[in-house]
UniProtKB/Swiss-Prot annotation:
Protein name listed in UniProt: Small ribosomal subunit protein bS16
Gene Ontology molecular function terms on file: structural constituent of ribosome
InterPro entries listed in its UniProt record: Ribosomal_bS16, Ribosomal_bS16_CS, Ribosomal_bS16_dom_sf
GO CC term (a single one): small ribosomal subunit
Length: 83
């Protein structure tokens, strides 16, 4: 099964997450199929905190990829900001 989830990056105490499409059996920060965007939880007011490639997200959902609950929440946040 293919899932859309967060892969952690960044340094200690400075988290940065990539939104990736990966096989469910792989490790959280392991191999992934495609990077769809990023989430920066500690972004300042003048920095972009979330970016998602909507066209690729739509494609992966159409072929059966399921998003994790956290990614679902981030997608809805990004949609609210865009509107």
């Amino acid at each position: 099964m293919v899932v859309i989830r967060l892969a952690r990056g960044g340094a200690k105490a400075r988290p940065f997450f990539n939104i990736v499409v990966a096989d469910k059996r792989t490790r959280r920060d392991g191999r992934f199929i495609e990077r769809l965007g990023f989430y920066n939880p500690i972004a300042t007011a003048n920095e972009e905190s979330i970016r998602i490639a909507q066209d690729r997200l739509t494609y992966w959902r159409s072929v059966g990829a399921q998003a994790s609950p956290t990614v679902e929440r981030l997608i809805s946040q990004a949609a609210k900001k865009a509107a």
